[in-house]
Amino acid sequence: MAHTHCISGLVGKLVMESEVNCNADKYYKLYKHHEDLPSVIPHIYTSVKAVEGHGTTSGCVKEWGYILEGKPLSCKEKTTYNDETRTIHHMVVAGDLMNDYKKFDATLVVNPKSNGHGCIVKWTIDYEKMNEDSPVPFGYLACYQQITEDLSSHLCASD
């Protein structure tokens, strides 16, 4: 697991990369077809629904209920997909995150390992804090790490 941090004043980028022992396409598809996530990892996702567009089409808007550091939260985000590169980009447009951030984008990229066994899961958070008192979103990076591990365990168990 590798972490990278680039923080300058109110703007920052956090990156988390992790090797997992499951197929890249399966991992990407489970996250893209998001409806199952609350049943697979209910300790993180409490709900998800598409509120504009179809949930697996670029440009759709989804509402997520989730738990972060023991607190129930929600957000609305616009999602784009690139199936060729196994990339999902979430741009938060409303919800609890907007209390601390002017901008909060989370990007998931899933790449197969060169040896053909497993994949590399990379989460990148690009953010702009609302003000100096807003926290650096390390809690979200830890949450994405937990999601990565839990989805990998779920997929490995179902293989």
UniProtKB/Swiss-Prot annotation:
Localization per Swiss-Prot or TrEMBL: Vacuole; Cytoplasmic vesicle
Pfam families in the record: Bet_v_1
Keywords, ordered alphabetically: Cytoplasmic vesicle, Vacuole
Function description: Not known; MLPs constitute up to 50% of the soluble latex protein.
Family, similarity comment: Belongs to the MLP family.
Superkingdom as given in the UniProt entry: Eukaryota
UniProt note on tissues of expression: Laticifer.
Gene3D superfamilies the UniProt entry points to: 3.30.530.20
Claim: Secreted is one of the keywords in the record: no
Swiss-Prot/TrEMBL GO biological process terms: defense response
Gene Ontology cellular-component annotations: cytoplasmic vesicle; vacuole
Keyword set includes Ribosomal protein: no
CDD domains per UniProt: Bet_v1-like
Name of the gene this protein is made from: MLP146
Name listed for the protein in its UniProt record: Major latex protein 146
